[in-house]
Design a protein with these regions (language model features):
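Short histidine-centered catalytic/ligand-binding loop motif
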Residues: 25-32, 114-115, 125-129, 198
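Compact, glycine/acidic-enriched structural inserts
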Residues: 105-162
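Aromatic- and glycine-enriched beta-alpha-beta binding-site module
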Residues: 71-130
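Gly/Pro-rich turn-and-neighbor structural signature
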Residues: 26, 30-69
């Protein structure tokens, strides 16, 4: 869980997103940072027994800096007004499928899968789907997964209009093969993060994503 003071810090930062305010509130930030790290540690403690691939992860592998990269952005606000928790065997610097928790006043959610893979990884995932699409269908149709997440998140930006090169339009998995991103998500109210059962509640949902993550990671870690 996060304290209400931590949520208030994020709200105040959003309203005062500048370096002077941040420096004036540095002590508040340090308290917030410890709270954030504790939350990540709690997720690791809850998830590691359920997914052995996470065993070597430490808190520092799963957090994000509060500073924004504004080099190529029109929005020059220097700080993020949200936090994320990323749990993956590939850590943050490697392309793998994983579990994600996003906490923001603008919209909080949990998610899993592989977001916008690079070209070579995308080819590997599509190849895996082409050969083992029945396995993927079984994962997505599992009753608890279907109840909590339903399907991949789909929008016009992450779906090709035509079949990808090398695949026929009548391939039985063509709707999966046309995807450019393979993630699924569920929204939650940000106030839930202040409740004592937040981590345990979210862990029960996140672990439902393990078969999907395993399927994708099997593809991206293959040699061919």
């Amino acid at each position: 869980m996060l304290s209400k003071d931590s949520l208030q810090f994020l709200d105040d930062l959003k309203a005062n997103n500048n370096r002077d305010w941040f420096l004036d509130n540095k002590k508040r930030y340090e308290v917030f940072k410890k709270d954030y790290q504790q939350l990540v540690g709690d997720f690791l403690d809850a998830m590691k027994p359920l997914d052995p691939s996470l065993e070597m992860l430490e808190v520092k592998n799963c957090t994000f800096r509060i500073n924004r990269d504004i080099r190529f952005s029109k929005d020059k606000s220097p700080y993020k007004d949200h936090i994320g928790v990323w749990l993956s065997s590939g850590s943050k610097g490697m392309n793998r499928s994983g579990y994600y928790v996003h906490i923001a006043r603008a919209g909080s959610f949990i998610a899993g899968g592989f977001y916008c893979p690079e070209a070579e990884d995308l080819k590997k995932v599509r190849k895996e789907i082409a050969y083992f699409y029945e396995d993927l269908e079984e994962i997505l149709k599992e009753k608890n997964f279907k109840k909590e997440f339903g399907d991949f998140d789909r929008n016009e930006k992450n779906i090709l209009k035509n079949p990808p090169r090398g695949y026929e339009k009548d391939h039985p998995a063509i709707e999966f093969l046309k995807l450019k991103s393979f993630e699924t998500s569920q929204k939650f109210d940000i106030e839930e993060v202040t409740k004592e059962d937040f981590v345990s509640k979210m862990t029960k949902k996140l672990i439902l994503l393990k078969p999907l993550n395993d399927f994708i990671n099997r593809a991206v870690t293959s040699e061919d």
